[in-house]
Amino acid sequence: MLILMLRSALFAFVGLAFFGWWVVADPSFEESASQSEWSYVLAFSGVILLLAFAVPTLAQLVGGRLAFRVSIVAAAGATLSSVANIFEDGLQMSWVFFVFILGAAFMQLGLLALTGVIAFSGRGGYRLLALVPAGTIAAIILFVVAGGPIMLATWLTAAMLALALSTRTPAQAARATP
């Protein structure tokens, strides 16, 4: 029961942290002076790094080795982007932008693959969890316009689904599968 609560708390924290950063930082398509302030750099890197922990935790909830392995790709991409952001914006090493983009690409591809794995191999209500990586992809693509609210809704939904689905036994989940 404690693991269930911690998992749900992590999911809720990801959504709240991302939304909080998005509101405070007020991202734009233009480069801003605050973008390279250490507080913003570290906060943004921290929010990205949260995904590296949350995505594999989500995959464990779904179950199966394939889901977990695919989630590691997304987590590695998030970690790479997080570290690259510190060098790019914090230390003003502009060439590291390409490393940031590479990490973001791995993260997006991993999330896309995870969406497919959950949707096609998940059982019963656990298929609903495919909405979480899909929503995360949408939040990243629409980052400037609506990334914070989308991420908040996505990961709060993950927290609620984690609580709701974990109260069902595997036999109940199997019976609910069409």
Question: Which residues make up each language-model segment?
Answer:
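Hydrophobic, aromatic-enriched alpha-helical segments typical of multi-pass transmembrane helices
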Residues: 1-178
